[in-house]
Amino acid sequence: MEIVFVSENENKIAEAREILLPLGFQSIFCGVTCRETGLTFTENAVLKAQAAVGSVKDVPIMADDSGICVDALNGMPGVLSSRWSQDGRNIDLLLWQMRDVPDVHRTAHFVCSIACVMPNTEVRTVSSVWHGRILHAPDGTGGFGYDPVFLPDGYSVSAAGLGSDLKNRISHRYKALRLMSSLLKRTYFSCHA
């Protein structure tokens, strides 16, 4: 089963590749520039997938928009996660904003929305979340983005310390890609095998 996964983020591409292959998908990865003007993760994922429609034919086109929502910051950075600070030091800004927040109020969750534009231009979307807490300092050397300061519920190390094998079986991106792959297998690929 072949799909196109659209992203300009090399880290997302690597994760998507690791997740999609065991789910039975051969993926072509494509970088398409798209302004993220949506107010939600789903709107941005749709914009990204639709941006590739003119350059790809006859296969479903998937795109991801994801980020972290911190309860003590009223859900921010949210859709602004990748551009939360002006200088790219997103973790530093987040930790500074959380400096006086006690542990009990450091709850957060990652969100991943996947949009898929079908060859007939029909759009399908799914979303998933991964709950946890914001640490007081970065921990771990793996992952990317906010992984070093995100402690997933039920774990004693940050997402950056889990290792890619475990992270890619429990994360928000894994859950969303698994949901979308199941949807595509039941609908599109059952008719286009």
From Swiss-Prot:
The keyword GTP-binding does not apply. GO terms for biological process: nucleotide metabolic process; purine nucleoside triphosphate catabolic process. It is an enzyme of class 3 (hydrolase). Gene3D superfamilies: 3.90.950.10. Pfam families: Ham1p_like (PF01725). Mg(2+) binds at residue 65. The active site is at residue 65. NCBIfam families: RdgB/HAM1 family non-canonical purine NTP pyrophosphatase. PANTHER family: INOSINE TRIPHOSPHATE PYROPHOSPHATASE (PTHR11067:SF9), INOSINE TRIPHOSPHATE PYROPHOSPHATASE/HAM1 PROTEIN (PTHR11067). This is dITP/XTP pyrophosphatase.
